[in-house]
Amino acid sequence: MSDSDSVRPGGAMNGTAERLDPTINAMTSAYDQATVVLHLERYRLAAEYVSGADVVDCACGTGYGSEILAQAGARSVQGVDLDRDALAFARLQHAHPAVTYYEADAIRYVPKPMPSVWVSLETLEHLPRPVEYVAHVASVLPPGGRFIVSVPVTVSTDGNRHHLTDFTRESLRGLLKRYGFAEERKLEQSHHFALSDVMGVSRGPRQRDRRRGLIRWYVRHPQVLWQRIKLTLTKGFVNEYLTVVAVKA
């Protein structure tokens, strides 16, 4: 067994797209391959803003994005996550002289050095207190600092048990504005899927993401069911995402 085998994604990282890594995940379906492309596009956008900067990559997961940011010329990258297994993998597979990985809570993490760029891709929807998190980021970044953030902007809490909050374009922008961020740039992404992708989730890397007992869950959350029906009738089977580069006033 090699060192990389000993920390190969297991536990929370095994059988979930929430801990994907383009270097190791067996993304065999077109849907899963598209998932990787979308994640990489977001990090490549963020990479355009990090040259010479001290950067936080919050919810860094397996660290592939932190490495991308370092390779783009960041002076330092603090990769932050709560998943100890993911961080162990990151330290081995995505080590870089400019990157340090920390096990920490996103809302309580106090970076050193203080960053001028805070990257937070597909994070807010997972947090029990996303408003508190944005307030924390705003308290850390200096005037002119950038908060690069992405969320799903179509309903996702029904299909993914790890998602706690559904955002819209308006709700994300309103939250950023509330804490003094002005939108500088955006990236809109669409991820179309077929019913067979949903039915085949048990065989793919998303098997641990799906919400079991969905009918009972819809009974408790009828507004989400209505949002899902409306989305499907108007746009078909699609997930949409918004990435915003926001500047602190």
Locations of regions flagged by a protein language model:
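Short, solvent-exposed loop/turn segments at secondary-structure boundaries
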Residues: G159-L164
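A short glycine-rich, Lys/Arg-flanked "PGG" loop and its adjoining helix->strand segment in the class I
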Residues: E132-P143
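A short His-aromatic
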Residues: E122-H126
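Conserved beta-strand signature within the Rossmann-like core of class I S-adenosyl-L-methionine
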Residues: G145-V151
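Conserved N-terminal segment of class I S-adenosyl-L-methionine
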Residues: M1-P113, V117, L121, V131-V134, ...
